[in-house]
Amino acid sequence: MAVNGASSSGLIVSFGEMLIDFVPTVSGVSLAEAPGFLKAPGGAPANVAIAVTRLGGKSAFVGKLGDDEFGHMLAGILKTNGVQAEGINFDKGARTALAFVTLRADGEREFMFYRNPSADMLLTPAELNLDLIRSAKVFHYGSISLIVEPCRAAHMKAMEVAKEAGALLSYDPNLRLPLWPSAEEAKKQIKSIWDSADVIKVSDVELEFLTGSNKIDDESAMSLWHPNLKLLLVTLGEKGCNYYTKKFHGTVGGFHVKTVDTTGAGDSFVGALLTKIVDDQTILEDEARLKEVLRFSCACGAITTTKKGAIPALPTASEALTLLKGGA
């Protein structure tokens, strides 16, 4: 499939959490010092689902929200953005998750979460829309849904059903250490489902965390390889990404843009990649085409860093193509 704005037909189902990010109106201050906050919908799997539709693809979200104003607002945002919402459940007893995000002057973030428990943690296997999951050509997920039961059991069931139905499994661990009981538990659970994934994307920081090495090199990345993996990606921020397949590996350069907020950049990158490969997985075996797709994905990620919040900043295909052509 050419790298253009053409709509893909295969369904990408994204599983996990959706929440409200409260982002300070001023960068470079602590949460206590922030004069105010901008309310921004977020949650990595939901960001990916919207990134896909923004680029002309077809996506659905599976997860649980609070039966509260924020939860219904988030469901409305998914629908407004063309994401199929038949996989959403609402919990009457728990609130929608909130995250307060500290923005450093360089746009990097620190998080403080309010989920004790939040609705997303309470999704059960019985609440899953299995028909929707079976219809996925790509099933995408993170690791936050592995932290506690019953959501962990729902995650495992959904993954198993998608795999049995022939979906490509896409995994972005999206490490958020403050949510885990310990770093050791985070590493153990993130690795517990490692060998099921066909495509894995980690950031350079996550690579260091998972390998225990401070080197971002091929040897370190390949220590995460497993025999059934089709593509391993290590994102490097504005430097682009490294890619690894069974037959080849290399680097795709990034884009220099004025970074305001890095929230959602990785999700935008993943959404772009999945939109391009959902109908033609042979791209994963053709280095020239894969590099073209990854360059497009890097452009999408870069654009997402130029605005505050994730979902408002996710680009259209034409915006990404403008940056690719050097017009931005």
From Swiss-Prot:
Keyword ATP-binding listed: yes
Pathways per UniProt: Glycan biosynthesis; starch biosynthesis
GO CC annotation: cytosol
GO molecular-function terms, A-Z: ATP binding; fructokinase activity
GO biological process assignments: fructose metabolic process; starch biosynthetic process
Domain of life of the native organism: Eukaryota
InterPro entries in the record: Carboh/pur_kinase_PfkB_CS, PfkB_Carbo_kinase, PfkB_dom, Ribo/fructo_kinase, Ribokinase-like
E.C. no: 2.7.1.4
Annotated catalysed reactions: D-fructose + ATP = D-fructose 6-phosphate + ADP + H(+)
Keyword annotations from UniProtKB, A to Z: ATP-binding, Carbohydrate metabolism, Kinase, Nucleotide-binding, Transferase
Function: May play an important role in maintaining the flux of carbon towards starch formation.
Similarity-based family: Belongs to the carbohydrate kinase PfkB family.
PANTHER family per record: FRUCTOKINASE-4-RELATED, HEXOKINASE FAMILY MEMBER
Protein name: Fructokinase-2
Organism: Solanum lycopersicum (Tomato)
Taxonomy of the source species: Eukaryota, Viridiplantae, Streptophyta, Embryophyta, Tracheophyta
